[in-house]
Swiss-Prot record:
GO cellular component, one term: plasma membrane-derived thylakoid membrane
Underlying gene: psbN
Bilayer topology term: Single-pass membrane protein
InterPro entries found in the cross-reference section: PSII_PsbN
Protein name: Protein PsbN
Function: May play a role in photosystem I and II biogenesis.
Protein source organism: Thermosynechococcus vestitus (strain NIES-2133 / IAM M-273 / BP-1)
Coiled coil start-end: none
Cysteine pairings via disulfide bonds: none
Keyword Transmembrane attributed: yes
NCBIfam families registered for this protein in UniProt: PRK13183.1 (NF009650)
UniProt keyword list: Membrane, Thylakoid, Transmembrane, Transmembrane helix
Length: 43
C-alpha cells in the first residue's frame, strides 16, 4: 500500500475512535458524573 493511503486510513481510524469515545462519555454511564453549569446557577 502507498504510505499516503496508510496514513489516511490511520487518521480516519483515530478520528472515528475519538468521536466514538466522546459520544460514550456524553451519553454512556460516565455521563452521570458530568455537571450541568446551568443547573448550578439558578436565578
Amino acid at each position: 500500500m502507498e504510505p499516503a493511503t496508510v496514513l489516511s486510513i490511520a487518521l480516519a481510524a483515530v478520528c472515528i475512535g475519538v468521536t466514538g469515545y466522546s459520544i460514550y462519555l456524553s451519553f454512556g454511564p460516565p455521563s452521570k458524573e458530568l455537571a450541568d453549569p446551568f443547573d448550578d446557577h439558578e436565578d
